[in-house]
Amino acid sequence: MGRWGHCLFGHDDAIGHAIKVSKDVAQGDDRQFAHMMSRVIVGCPPGVFGFYVEEYSLAEKIGPGEMEASMDQLIRHKLDSGLGDELFEKYRAAEQHGFDFDDMSKYLVIIFAAVLMGYGAKIKESQIQHLRDLVPKLQCNEGVVPPFGDSGFRGPGKRQFLAALDHYQAGKRRSFTQPSCHGCGKVNGDIKAEGKTLMKCGGCKNERATAWFCDKDCQKGLWKHHKHNCGAPLGRGIALFRSFGKNSFGVIAYDGANV
C-alpha cells in the first residue's frame, strides 16, 4: 500500500496494525488510545497525519504535555501486568492458524513488538526468538514497489527492527520514529559508545525518506540499493486507508513516491 518512508512506521499497513494494537491495549480508554496513536503517526505526511487526527478526534483526547510521562508508565504497567503476554499469544495464534494474506498476521506481531519496545515493556526471551525467526518470513524490498504489491518491510525498516531486538532492554523505551542507520539499523544511542553519530545522506532531498548512516562503510554497503531512492522526491504517492479508520475507505496523496 502507501509508503512514505523506509523505516518501520513509514507505511500505511504498519499504521493500520498499530491502530489495532492501540485499541487492544487501550481497552476502550480514549485518552490512552489517543496517546498511543499520537506516537505512531508523528512521522506521517501532513495529509495522512491530519486524516487520523480528524478521524479519531485525537486533538480533543490528548492531555497536556506533562501527562505524557505518566501515561507512558500507565501503559507499560498494563502491558507488564499480563496484557502484553496475552496479546502476544493472541496475535501469534492468528499468525499460525489463520489465513495470512500478504503475511498480514505475521506483520501484526512485528508491529506489536515494536509497540512493546516503544514503551519499554517486558518481552520474554522466547518471544524475542520467535520475532527473530519471523522476520525472514516477511517480504522485504530495498526499493520502489507498486503500491498493491508493497507489503512487509523496506530493508532499512527490517534492519531497524532487528537492531532494536539486539539492543532491547526491559524498562528502556525504543523509538521507531527517530533516525536509524539504513545500513545496520542502529540509532544514535547504540553507536554513541563507539564515538559515532548518525549522518544524513547529503544527496537525499526527500525529507521523510532521507537516509541516515552510522559510517561510510554502511553507506557504501547500501549504495547499490540507495542510489535508486536518493535525490529529490519523485511523483505522487498514495496512502490507502481501507478499513483502518471509522470510514470504510480513504485515500490521501502525498509528494514523493521514490521510496
For the regions a protein language model found, what residue spans apply to each?
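Short alpha-helical interaction motifs and adjacent low-complexity tails used for partner binding
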Residues: 1-259
